[in-house]
């Protein structure tokens, strides 16, 4: 996950899995920020990657709310 999670992979997840990924990413971002503040962070690039992953997850959730993308496994 050095380059983050591609949006097409996130679109294949259901709503519950997306929420789980979002929670995990937010926790990781919190820990990375804490490490940066204490001078223990060795990979500064990871901060940016995690922020972008969070934004991608929010984008996929919003696309589904607006009906721009379909929820996998949901038959119309």
Curated annotation (Swiss-Prot):
Task: Name the HAMAP family for this protein.
Answer: Ribosomal_uL29
Please spell out the taxonomic lineage of the organism that makes this protein: Bacteria, Bacillati, Actinomycetota, Actinomycetes, Mycobacteriales
Q: Which domain of life is it from?
A: Bacteria
The organism named in the record is Corynebacterium diphtheriae (strain ATCC 700971 / NCTC 13129 / Biotype gravis)
What NCBIfam families has UniProt attached to this entry?
L29
What parts of the sequence cross the membrane? none
Protein name (Swiss-Prot/TrEMBL): Large ribosomal subunit protein uL29
What keywords sit in the KW lines?
Ribonucleoprotein, Ribosomal protein
Family note: Belongs to the universal ribosomal protein uL29 family.
Which BP terms does GO give this entry? translation
Q: Does the keyword S-adenosyl-L-methionine apply?
A: no
Q: Name one GO cellular component term.
A: cytosolic large ribosomal subunit
Gene Ontology terms for molecular function: structural constituent of ribosome
């Amino acid at each position: 996950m050095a380059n983050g999670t591609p949006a097409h992979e996130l679109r294949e997840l259901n709503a519950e899995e997306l929420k789980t990924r979002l929670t995990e990413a937010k926790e990781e971002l919190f820990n990375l920020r804490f490490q940066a503040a204490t001078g223990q962070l060795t990979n500064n690039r990871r901060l940016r990657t995690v922020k972008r992953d969070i934004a991608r997850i929010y984008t996929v959730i919003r696309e589904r709310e607006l009906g721009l993308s379909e929820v996998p496994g949901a038959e119309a």
